[in-house]
Amino acid sequence: MLKKKIGKIVTASAVTACVLVNATAAMLPSMSMVAFAGQELGQMDFNDGVGLPWHICESGPGKMKFNIDGGTYNIEIVEPGGAAKGGESRWDCQFRHRGLILEAGHTYEVKAEVTADHDGQIYTKIGDSGSPYREPWHNGYGGNEGNGWNCMQVTANKTLKIESTFTCTENIEVGEWAWQFGGAGQHQSTDCFPAGTKLKFDNMSLIDKTDDKTDYDVLHPKKDVPEGQVRVNQVGYFSTLQKQATAVVENGTAAQKFSLLDASGKEVYTGTSSATRYDEDSQQYIQVLDFSDFTTAGTYTISCGGKGSYSFKIGNDVYDGILTDAVNYFYQNRSGIDLEEKYITSTGMNESKADLVHVAGHVPDTAYIQSKWIKSYKADGSDVDKSSGTLNGQGGWYDAGDHGKYVVNGGISIWTLNNMYERVLDSDNNSKESKWADNSGTVVIPENGNKIPDILDETKVEMDWMMEMVVPSGYKMTYDASAYGGSDTGKYENMVFHKLHDHKWTGLGVRPNDYADEWGTIRIVKPPSTAATLNFVANAAQTARLWKDIDSTYADKLLKQAKLSYEAAKANPELYAPLDQAIGGGAYGDTNVKDDFYWAACELYATTKDSSYLTDMKGYADCFKVTTNLEGGENNGSFSSFNWGNTAGLGSLTMYLNRDILDAADAKTLSDSIKKAADTYIAKEEEQGYGIPYQGATFTDAINLGYDDSGKLIEVNGYEWGSNSFVVNNAIVMAYAYDITKDAKYIDGVSTAMDYVFGRNAMDFSYVTGYGTYHCENPHHRFWSHELDSTFPYAPSGVMSGGANSGIQDPYVRGMGYKLGTLAPQLCYIDSVEAWSVNEVTINWNSPFAWVVSFLEDEAPLVDRDTPATTAKTTEGGTTSTTTSTGTALYGDVDCNGKIEINDIVLLSRYVAQDATAKAPTAQGLINADCENNGSIDAGDITAIARYLAHLCEASELGPQ
């Protein structure tokens, strides 16, 4: 989340990057306005309901609400801020337009109107966005002429009109027009306005009377994006997998022909669309176009009903390069090292890889250890607790767009990348260990050449940082159980601190090595939590398991600390991280840690085989299960199997990879649960117009959305923050189902999920930088801030945006005129670095993105749809087989003699009972045995055959219905 401060150098390209003008243009507010020669502003009268590039800017504790209605930009001051309340001054509440260029010797005409419903003061200035803070015009005067730093007086309900001219004496290349009306502080003896004041802005104008070379329309020409109504995976489709596109049509359109065209425009395939149906998540009428049976490699487009698509490829190499770029995200977000050009794998939209290098940040990363949870600190940091000493938290990964480092988010990210590697050690799939071998080229990092799998080198960076977050002896804290719930023992040694970040927010366009002095930030470590401790335990145990044959000393060190920290967590089972600690860093609150205990026990059991951990695992209600509904913490019925706040699914997937230490019944429960979850996601894909294995939820956001006028939390029904992360996490579950069954429907499900990410969505937009014709360019990131400041780089390729979010919490998105509940979930997106609620990137989103890409590039080329797929899974209690077929089955004919008879019941009964003296059914026999068509062979199938032999059902009622 972004809280910006007055005076940060930026060059806002504003609306250019934010307006996704394509096939959804009709869904977006119009940006049309009357143009004037020399007009420097991108918006003047707000008559079309759009505010951008004008936007509010808050610095805590300053807070505002706004809307764009009635032809004015309307702002309510909720809290003016100011030094006495922990802020700075009047710039705690601002309204501004950035991206201005002013030229020496040019004369400018300024006009504006502002009305307030209370008497007060306001300061307005045109000049530098940051140092050296030149102001060729403020408050109607050029320079400091006749005004100094004083404000203009505003009379309640009387419009203040400004009409002025000035001549600029110096070139200003990074300029802004800002209005300041916050609290008392430097240069401001009183609050500008009381809380509750409402202001209206209108008829803004800044005209260069000398020439029009820096007109807004000249500097920010509209992007000419081809309009198409056929949405495809813009990267491409694997030859042997399902291939579907979505056409946007009018209601009532009949099923119609579509054509696949090669690069020369020649028609090479035709098909017929599905019937027209309404897609709720896009609020569009759509037809699905299926061309799965076309397998010829090449580059193509689709034509349907006179509309076309972006180009895409078909082949088995369509994802080449993506994995390397996706995992390079982690190198480029390392803390505490100089980034070097030779380890950067892509240029993105930059001129060269050299644009992406920077000097090491936070060396050392000295942070003050906090003894209590404090929601916000004073801007000057005078109330930061320094009595508990410091911790050097150097290293690790920066979490997202900010410079914070968080144990719980690092936890799932380490697990996902480690799990991606551990999966290749399973001989039952087609992934090769050599892919991750040292110096293989998949992962490009400074550790190449040390004879250690490179992906493990990368996760070790974060694991080693976590080790630094372990609580030392003697630490004391004050925990407010009445406010946060849970309980406190007062003994914290071997617990783990929750997070490390700045004491307040910084702005965008900052380098990790040089912002602290300018922004006045202090690094802090928040108190320990049970959730952070258990994340550490799980990661340390998992990492120890993978390193034991590589570096036993390191593995032993991790495992020893994991055991100690696990016992510390059991002694503090309810030391919760509050949900509201979101100033200076993400909150990452968690008040339900039963799932974390289960995950930690799973990892410890998989590593040690100590039965005490198995006992702990079995105390969890959903032991050996993968669910599709996340509850607790920040989730309220999220349609997914795991995320950073709900980690039980991680433990279950770990146990699947280590199923040889489970008994047959537990192994079967686990595999059946994975398949059931995957089937749920496939069913959702088939229901959705764009094939997304996700659905929205009803959620609240006390921090960013707050409460309505009656004091009730504002509820949103739609896509959640980081919706794309749910898509790729759910794809991982389908991938495991494919590993279990080798049933192509599951890998089709994985591929279909990625189709959505790469462009088959309502935005007709690839959410991954550098991949797809029309792709993400400006994710929310402090260093990758070229959109705002041309001295900073664009993001590299291979970065996945969080995507559509019905909460649209940030003022930039709201500045488009979007209002809660009025826009289709899939359309709640803008590609801007300032749109932190919809365009954030983070380690726990890029890790599953990399996982899924890795899976598909290994497995997709080897899918065989012409033969039954049988996979034997060896367990401690025996062998179970799961077989699927695309051929013909006689359900009930277990012994494959062409008849259904009592012998089939006998054979199947002995198989289910694991009678080692009996001959097992053949692969086809197991297909025939699945009479309930649920992907498992059990007593229910025996009953089904018995019902048939007793003439209680027809043969046609066995198997698929």
Regions found by a protein language model. Name each.
Residues 21, 28, 867-961:
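Cellulosome-associated attachment modules in secreted, modular CAZymes
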Residues 44-48, 95-122, 162-168, 203-204:
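Extra-cytoplasmic beta-strand recognition segments
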Residues 45-83:
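Extracellular glycan-recognition surfaces and repeat-rich motifs
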Residues 46, 124-126, 160-199, 203-204:
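Extracellular beta-strand ligand-recognition surfaces/modules
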Residues 53-58, 77-104, 121-150, 176, ...:
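Secreted extracellular polysaccharide-interacting domains
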Residues 133-174, 278, 284:
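Extracellular carbohydrate recognition and processing domains
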Residues 234-305, 333-411, 415, 419-420, ...:
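Aromatic (Trp/Tyr) and acidic
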Residues 317-340, 458-474, 559-577, 611-635, ...:
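Long, well-ordered core segments of solenoidal/helical folds
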